[in-house]
């Protein structure tokens, strides 16, 4: 009888679905303003309830499952700890912002763009994935914006979506929303590259480029989402 019970339990355990694979992303961003170009390389690991972001000497580990974020300086071997809302708990409603216009916001003014988006018909391979291009133009008072972005179909069996991560360096919230809405209309496609050009009426053109170099669904190395034991918490 015991043998039958053990065999039944083992058969059930073997039939349990394995967790979806982690997602590993490496991408490069470029910010061009006048004659200056600033290039940054970013690495992300994304798993269930946790992620890691690495940018040069800076390391951030987000543990939604534990309700904490660790931010570290690899060179100094120190880190800070910030509490966040754990997974599954309601997020507090943010306060309603006051009225903001271009005079009060100044450099951070975000115009309200009217977007026209279309598929260009162009295709390319980015990080080993076949991609298609979309182009968009945005008109607003005192500003114009032109955006091109490349998208691929999701990797089979992968539930993590890299789009938020890849779009993070883009400067305009309106551009990001336009990209998110467009990809949602095309089967939840993933963003792998984008170029954003903003032309304010009273400032030089600003260009932001982002492009994925590595995209793979693999299991993260052991300890990826843990703070290295040799690191010390700042202020202690």
Question: In which residue ranges do the predicted regions lie?
Answer:
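Extended soluble regions of mature proteins
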Residues: 14-236
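Sec-dependent signal peptide recognition
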Residues: 1-9
């Amino acid at each position: 009888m015991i043998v039958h019970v053990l065999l039944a339990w083992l058969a059930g355990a073997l039939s349990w679905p394995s967790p979806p694979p982690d997602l590993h992303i490496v991408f490069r961003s470029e910010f061009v303003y006048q004659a200056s170009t600033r290039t940054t390389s970013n690495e992300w690991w994304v798993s269930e309830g946790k992620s890691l972001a690495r940018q040069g000497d800076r390391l951030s580990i987000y543990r939604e499952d534990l309700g904490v974020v660790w931010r570290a300086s690899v060179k100094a071997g120190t880190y800070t700890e910030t509490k966040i809302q754990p997974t599954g708990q309601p997020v507090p409603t943010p306060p309603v912002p006051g009225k903001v216009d271009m005079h009060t916001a100044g450099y951070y003014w975000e115009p309200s763009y009217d977007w026209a988006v279309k598929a260009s018909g162009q295709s390319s391979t980015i990080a080993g994935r076949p991609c298609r291009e979309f182009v968009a133009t945005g008109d607003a008072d005192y500003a114009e914006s032109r955006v091109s972005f490349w998208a691929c179909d999701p990797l089979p069996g992968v539930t993590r979506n890299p789009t938020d991560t890849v779009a993070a360096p883009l400067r305009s919230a309106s551009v990001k929303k336009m990209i998110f809405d467009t990809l949602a209309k095309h089967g939840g496609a993933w963003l792998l590259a984008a170029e954003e050009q903003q032309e304010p009426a009273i400032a030089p053109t600003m260009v932001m480029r982002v492009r994925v170099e590595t995209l793979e669904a693999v299991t993260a190395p052991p300890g990826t989402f843990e703070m290295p034991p040799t690191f010390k918490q700042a202020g202690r």
